[in-house]
Amino acid sequence: MLNSIIPDLNFIEYGGGQIAYRESGQGPTILLFHGMNGSSKSWASLFNSLGDKFRLVAWDAPSFGESDVFGDSIEDYTNAAKALISSLEVEDIIIIGHSMGGLIATRLAGDKDVSRAGFVLSSCHLGFGRPKGEALMSRYADRINALTEREVDMSYALERAQRSTPEGTPKHVREYLVEVAKGARMELSLIHI
């Protein structure tokens, strides 16, 4: 059901690879940055509910969804996001970042070269990165190890969907989140956030 309302993928060339994104609607531009294990599909309900009032652009961060693998730091992701913004030729964007996407959104909000009209953070944190060689916090290391050990299987996807939704979440929403989580890739173990 939610899959039927998301727009097709578009791509820009960047860093020797491609960044995937979805775009629809007209009006002020809202740029959407998903969290870890997410993708542009994470924003399906917004495409449905806001697409008639806003131009929505949701990316697949590098190493997520259909974007190519490159870069392993928030700085790398922020530079990729700036390339996407530049390719869209927009000013006064509204930036929305969820979880890991909030780290990127925060960097963009503080960048004098990014023209923005608004800024929204959802379920964000200051970042729990560690110097190279130092262990990640256990909750992030456990998520990455789960991907590494069993790749992405149905049990991993079900676990992620259940942990990220409250009791009483409609079945079709959880099923969609399972589909999004199944798209997580092994390359996530390389990311330094």
Where do the PLM segments sit?
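Flexible "cap/lid" loop of the alpha/beta hydrolase fold
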Residues: T106-D111, S115-E149
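Gly/Ala-rich beta-loop-alpha elbow adjacent to hydrolase catalytic centers
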Residues: G97, G101, A105
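Conserved HGGG/HGGXW glycine-rich cap/lid loop of the alpha/beta-hydrolase fold
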Residues: G17-E66
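Active-site loop/oxyanion-hole signature of alpha/beta-hydrolase fold enzymes
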Residues: S45-N48, V57-I96
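Structural signature of beta-strand start/N-cap positions in the alpha/beta core
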Residues: T29, R55, E91-I94, S115-G118
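N-terminal cap/lid segment of alpha/beta-hydrolase-fold proteins
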Residues: L2-Q18
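Helix-loop "lid/cap" segments that line or gate small-molecule binding pockets
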Residues: D142-E149, A157-T169, E179-A181
